[in-house]
Amino acid sequence: MATEGLAGALATVLGGKGLLVQSCDSEPAGKPLFPVRLRKNVCYVVLAVFLNEQDEVLMIQEAKRECRGTWYLPAGRMEPGETIVEAMQREVKEEAGLLCEPVTLLSVEERGASWIRFVFLARPTGGVLKTSKDADSESLQAGWYPRVSLPTPLRAHDVLHLVELGAKFCQQAMHPLILPQELPCSVVCQRLVTTFTTVQSVWVLVGTVGTPHLPITACGFTPMEQRGGIKVAILRLLQECLTLHSLAVETKGLLGLQHLGRDHVDGVCLNVLVTVAFRNPGIQDEPPKIRGENYFWWKVLEEDLQKLLLYRLQESSVIPLSR
């Protein structure tokens, strides 16, 4: 990929869009990569936050035996063959009775590659709110409740943070409206936009194997990788080309993600914004030295692209990625 191609790829990723995953630049040691499968080695969960003009939150009352009678946000596991958005819409219809459309991804949570939760801000488009007369195995009922006075008992208190995240986004968007892109991927992986900045310039790490490209690192499923989370795969790739003990590495968040659950292809690719800086900066006008020949630092010269990238970095204009 020439410089024009790299600029186009970076613009695509910064715009929340996706790119085909051709291969991975870094893979876990040992066993070869194998395609991931829902219900076998990965679990994806969807959750929706709804806030109306009265500052009320859509809550559902759980019917499951282990948490029956408690309250939570509409949520559930993805099924094979679904897109992420389809799964969210199905869960909302089953648990709350409403039809809906996504507004944006609010956050992505992970416990390693085997468990990922996609949190949406959504709006209702139709349907009939589920009442206690409609109780079934999916939920007992649904209702709108003041954000400052949610029904109790809550199934789990993590909803409080997610509701506040949604309210904050409604008041002032922290990042562009971003939705999952429907592009297939066979593994759980991350496309890295790894940056190094000085007062005047910004560089992006590029993979050289094949056509120059934004590098991709595959996530592993060993106990150590599950404990460390998907950041382990980021550090693995960077360790292959940089001397990390002298550097500070920060995962800023997500620029977007892609998935297409068709033909038994259940992988997901997260586009992740990462910063690299010297621990003892002093006056550093050049990025850290690359080891080997599989990567290089690309200096972004396109003014519009440089401004956009610096804005996303300085304002942390990304989807939160948390554990």
Swiss-Prot record:
Motif annotated as Nudix box, chain positions: 76-97
InterPro entries named among the record's database cross-references: Nudix_hydrolase (IPR020476), NUDIX_hydrolase-like_dom_sf (IPR015797), NUDIX_hydrolase_CS (IPR020084), NUDIX_hydrolase_dom (IPR000086), NUDT18_NUDIX (IPR042970)
Catalytic activity reported: 8-oxo-dGDP + H2O = 8-oxo-dGMP + phosphate + H(+); 8-oxo-dADP + H2O = 8-oxo-dAMP + phosphate + H(+); 2-oxo-dADP + H2O = 2-oxo-dAMP + phosphate + H(+); 8-oxo-GDP + H2O = 8-oxo-GMP + phosphate + H(+)
BP GO annotations: dADP catabolic process; dGDP catabolic process; GDP catabolic process
Function as written in the Swiss-Prot or TrEMBL entry: Mediates the hydrolysis of oxidized nucleoside diphosphate derivatives. Hydrolyzes 8-oxo-7,8-dihydroguanine (8-oxo-Gua)-containing deoxyribo- and ribonucleoside diphosphates to the monophosphates. Hydrolyzes 8-oxo-dGDP and 8-oxo-GDP with the same efficiencies. Also hydrolyzes 8-OH-dADP and 2-OH-dADP. Exhibited no or minimal hydrolysis activity against 8-oxo-dGTP, 8-oxo-GTP, dGTP, GTP, dGDP and GDP. Probably removes oxidized guanine nucleotides from both the DNA and RNA precursor pools.
Every Nudix hydrolase domain range: 37-167
One MF term in the entry's GO annotations: 8-hydroxy-dADP phosphatase activity
Keywords tagged on the record: Hydrolase, Magnesium, Manganese, Metal-binding, Nucleotide metabolism
Name assigned to this protein: 8-oxo-dGDP phosphatase NUDT18
Known EC number: 3.6.1.58
Cofactor needs: Mn(2+); Mg(2+)
Keyword Iron appears in the UniProt entry: no
Protein family per UniProt: Belongs to the Nudix hydrolase family.
Gene giving rise to this polypeptide: Nudt18
PANTHER family to which the protein is assigned, alphabetical: 8-OXO-DGDP PHOSPHATASE NUDT18 (PTHR22769:SF56), MUTT/NUDIX HYDROLASE (PTHR22769)
Residues noted as binding Mg(2+) in the record, renumbered to the chain: 58
Provenance organism: Mus musculus
Alphabetized PROSITE patterns for the sequence: NUDIX, NUDIX_BOX
Lineage: Eukaryota, Metazoa, Chordata, Craniata, Vertebrata
